[in-house]
From Swiss-Prot:
Residues 141-166, 173-191 have a biased composition (Low complexity). GTP binds at residues 353-360, 400-404, 454-457. The gene is infB. The lineage of its organism: Bacteria, Pseudomonadati, Pseudomonadota, Alphaproteobacteria, Sphingomonadales. Residues 454-457 are annotated as: G4. It comes from Sphingopyxis alaskensis (strain DSM 13593 / LMG 18877 / RB2256). Its main location: cytoplasm. This is Translation initiation factor IF-2. GO terms for molecular function: GTP binding; GTPase activity; translation initiation factor activity. GO terms for cellular component: cytosol. It comes from the Bacteria. Residues 101-140, 194-215 have a biased composition (Basic and acidic residues).
Length: 845
């Protein structure tokens, strides 16, 4: 084309695109007679070049016919440039640039192919030369040495090996001008004809080196976008990995049958068939078939026992390892320390006795503190742990237990964790029920007892009477020839305290108390509570080992990490040694008093043990004894006859809540019983109020108060709060409320008895009975029971009372009278009438 032909010329016809799309309509038919009309368009694209013209034959064939000195593979035919589709939107310059790029890409691909072929030839020649040299050395070693012919024979081979690379240079140089002269040269461009390549697909486009506008070459045109899929796509990494895995599997299968892998299968008490198959790396269907052969028709989701699982594991050639759920738990009692690692520890002393006998006052005198003043009502309602340093520098740990009857479990807990029990008995009061209970707790725990006779300075004190009363409970003091130490003390005057400390030191020396501090810590929960600012807090008495900040532990059904340790003086410490009481912060929840704290290796182990214990506790709560039909009906009858008194209990510490629940359960009778909906330590929350509102139950708060949100809900739902700080005030008020639920007590007082002598009509419907009064008197309006042969016929009242024909109010014994009974006419001669009056009294529990 010339420039004049390329110039656009104006015509009188309107500008526009020729129609290249032919449209038609096709009807799609579906089921049930449905049809859909679809418009189909057929696009036509113009092709550059004449329809019958063949592609120009490149002159590279002449170069290809040149003799090659080496048997190199034939060069691939140069691909003729594909007639590019002419787009009406492309200009002539863009079409020429596209042709030039395609030619340049073909030329670069041919050069790259020639370079790779040359490298392969050189490598093959070098390998052949190396093989020939090794062969010559082997021949020289076996035969007689002939040095002259060997280099001469190898010279032609070396020359022949070096010849092919040198001969390929002229071929390539000859091919380049031939390729350049064969391509049709457009105006101001000299495209190069590409060598034919063996692969039919076009390679990835590469940037040309010159002669082209680079800014325009990188632009995305319509033609490039439409022909994008014609280029070769590289395989993704995922496809390569899949191919390698497939090849590896094919090699493994082709190598022969694989040897069966024997596994150690861990089998718990019960396991499903599918889970067992997964652990053995077998198919679940194979296990089901094996069980069917054993006569057990099961599915993969059914559970089998450990013995059946062992048969399956053995049959499939694996090894079994039996485990039990109980193995998850920690058995601290089986871990015994070596005697060489034990070191002396401080004695743990529990002070026990009856209420108001001066236990806390005695401990205050020993500590030099005033704990008793902080207790509500002057009585101890919490179990406290303290350490006292004696004059010789030794340390003694004291546990102060409540003396009230409601705190039985607290006293029992204190006796179980202690080494020595100090029984405090008031000299003027003697032994009381809780004193005797403390003696029984100490005997059950196998703990030695030291008797402290307190209040010897008070008038009416008689210590000798206390010693004599102790003989009734098999406690023989030293003054009477026994082995039980007793000390007369006065907490008020602080007399006899040194003797008491000496007695404790002597008893501890006899017992030789030791523990291993260089091991994981173990301790017992003395008390637990939910603090508003600190969260769950537990008072722990360390039994052995050393508890440190950061230790991970399990405490009952709760787990956690030690965030802080606080001693009995309120100071934070870094660690707690054996026999040391500390407050532990960092629990996941409030544990139960009496639980054991054990330090474990990691959090996963702690959570596993805690979850197992929670599951066991849930099973224990929800487990029910086998119920018979008779038992079911009797339970329903009891439930219908017994009134329930629901309560929600919140206390400051777990021990107090436990004591309140036990005290309220003792108030239950055959007619009414306490139903504890929820009992826990901590402040009264919104959930507590919501629970109480749903059942119309009062909320009992022991040394706790509700938050603002809970008070708001309580005012809206009309929920009652009962606040207490002394436990016997709480039990007294609850007993009154339970009695009020029952209503007044109905008491019957028999007034008189009479015998029916005759029956005669009285009016149209009623019958009158002629009576002889045998005992007491009969009055009008009283309640009466008519009996026949000692069987009650009717319960009624006396509607009318007459003597002869006169109405009277009362008839005494020995006289005859006539009565009309209300609501009954079933009266016969010989019946007996019992007259009584009803008295309503206020109930007491």
């Amino acid at each position: 084309m010339s420039d004049e032909q390329d110039k656009p010329t104006l015509s009188r016809k309107p500008l526009g695109l020729k129609r290249t799309v032919e449209a038609g309509q096709v009807q799609q038919q579906f089921s049930h007679g449905r049809r859909n009309t679809v418009v189909v368009e057929v696009k036509r694209r113009r092709v550059l070049g004449r329809p019958g013209e063949a592609a120009p034959t490149p002159e590279v064939e002449e170069a290809k016919a040149a003799p090659a000195p080496a048997p190199a593979p034939a060069a691939p035919r140069p691909a003729a440039p594909k007639p590019a589709a002419v787009d009406s939107l492309m200009t002539r310059q863009e079409r020429q640039a596209q042709l030039l790029r395609e030619a340049e890409e073909a030329r670069m691909a041919a050069l790259e192919e020639n370079r790779r072929r040359e490298e392969a030839e050189r490598a093959r020649a070098a390998e052949e030369e190396r093989a020939r040299a090794e062969k010559r050395e082997e021949q020289a070693a076996t035969k007689a040495p002939e040095p002259a012919p060997t280099p001469a024979a190898s010279a032609p081979d070396a020359t022949a090996a070096d010849a092919p690379p040198a001969a390929e240079g002229p071929v390539e140089t000859a091919a380049r001008p031939a390729t350049a002269s064969a391509a049709p040269a457009p105006r101001r461009f000299t495209p190069v004809e590409a060598l034919k390549r063996p692969e039919p697909k076009r390679p990835e486009p590469k940037a040309s080196r010159g002669g082209e506008n680079r800014r325009q070459s990188g632009k995305l045109t319509v033609t490039r976008a439409l022909n994008e899929d014609e280029g070769a796509r590289a395989r993704s990494l995922a496809a390569l990995k899949r191919a390698r895995e497939k090849e590896k599997r094919s090699h493994m299968t082709s190598s022969g049958p694989r040897e069966k892998q024997v596994r150690e299968v861990v089998v718990p008490d019960t396991i499903t068939v599918q889970e067992l198959a997964n652990r053995m790396a077998e198919k679940g269907a194979d296990l089901v078939k094996a069980l069917f052969k054993m006569g057990m028709p099961v599915t993969v989701n059914q559970t089998i026992d450990q013995d059946t699982a062992e048969l399956l594991v053995t049959e499939f050639g694996h090894e079994i390892k039996r485990v039990s759920e109980a193995d998850i738990d920690i058995r601290h009692d089986e871990d015994v320390d070596d005697a060489a690692q034990l070191k002396p520890r401080a004695p743990v002393v529990t002070i026990m006795g009856h209420v108001d006998h001066g236990k806390t006052s005695l401990l205050d005198a020993l500590r030099g503190a005033n704990v008793q003043a902080g207790e509500a009502g002057g009585i101890t309602q919490h179990i406290g742990a303290y350490q006292v340093k004696a004059k010789d520098g030794s340390v003694i740990t004291f546990l102060d237990t409540p003396g009230h009857e409601a705190f039985t479990e607290m006293r029992q807990r204190g006796a179980n964790v202690t080494d020595i029990v100090i029984l405090v008995v008031a000299a003027d009061d003697g032994l009381k029920p809780q004193s005797i209970e403390a003696i029984n707790h100490a005997k059950a725990a196998g703990v030695p007892i030291i008797v402290a006779i307190n209040k010897v300075d008070k008038e009416g004190a008689n210590p000798q009477r206390v010693r004599e009363r102790l003989l009734e409970h098999e406690l023989v003091v030293e003054e009477m020839g026994g082995d039980v130490q007793n000390v007369e003390v006065s907490a008020l005057k602080k007399t006899g305290l040194d003797k008491l400390l000496d007695a404790i030191a002597l008893q501890a020396e006899i017992m030789e108390l030791k523990a291993n501090p260089d091991r994981a810590a173990e301790g017992t929960v003395i008390e637990a509570k939910l603090d508003k600012g600190r969260g769950p807090v537990a008072t722990i008495l360390v039994r052995r080992g050393t508890l440190k900040v950061g230790d991970i532990f399990v405490c009952g059904a709760e787990s956690g990490r030690v965030r802080a340790l606080v001693d009995d003086h309120g100071k934070q410490v870094k660690q707690a040694t054996p026999s040391m009481p500390v407050e532990v912060l960092g629990l996941g929840g409030v544990p139960m008093a009496g639980d054991t704290l054990i330090v474990v290796e990691n959090e996963a182990r702690a959570r596993e043990v805690a979850a197992y214990r929670q599951e066991q506790a849930l099973k224990k709560r929800t487990a029910q004894a086998p119920v018979s039909l008779e038992g079911m009906f009797s339970a329903l009858a009891d439930k219908a006859n017994v009134i329930e008194y629901p309560v929600v209990i919140k206390g400051d510490v777990q021990g107090s809540v436990e004591a309140i629940v036990n005290a309220l359960n003792k108030l239950s009778t055959d007619e009414i019983r306490v139903r504890v909906l929820h009992a826990g330590a901590g402040a009264i929350t919104e959930s507590d109020v919501t629970l109480a509102a749903s059942t119309r139950a009062p909320i009992i708060g022991f040394n706790v108060r509700p938050n603002a949100k809970a008070r708001e809900i309580a005012n809206r739902e009309k929920v009652r709060f009962l606040y207490y700080d002394v436990i016997y005030h709480l039990t007294a008020d609850v007993a009154k409320e339970m009695a009020g639920e029952l209503g007044p007590e109905r008491i019957e007082n028999v007034v008189g008895r009479a015998e029916v002598k005759d029956v005669f009509p009285a009016g149209k419907r009623d019958k009158a009975a002629g009576l002889l009064v045998l005992e007491g008197s009969i009055r009008k309006g009283l309640h009466a029971r008519l009996t026949r042969d000692d069987v009650i016929v009717s319960a009624t009242t006396i509607a009318s009372l007459r003597r002869f024909k006169d109405d009277v109010a009362e008839v005494r014994a020995g006289l005859e009278c006539g009565v009309v009974l209300a609501d009954t006419n079933d009266i016969k001669p010989g019946d007996h009438l019992e007259v009584f009056e009803v008295e309503l009294r206020e109930r007491t529990l």
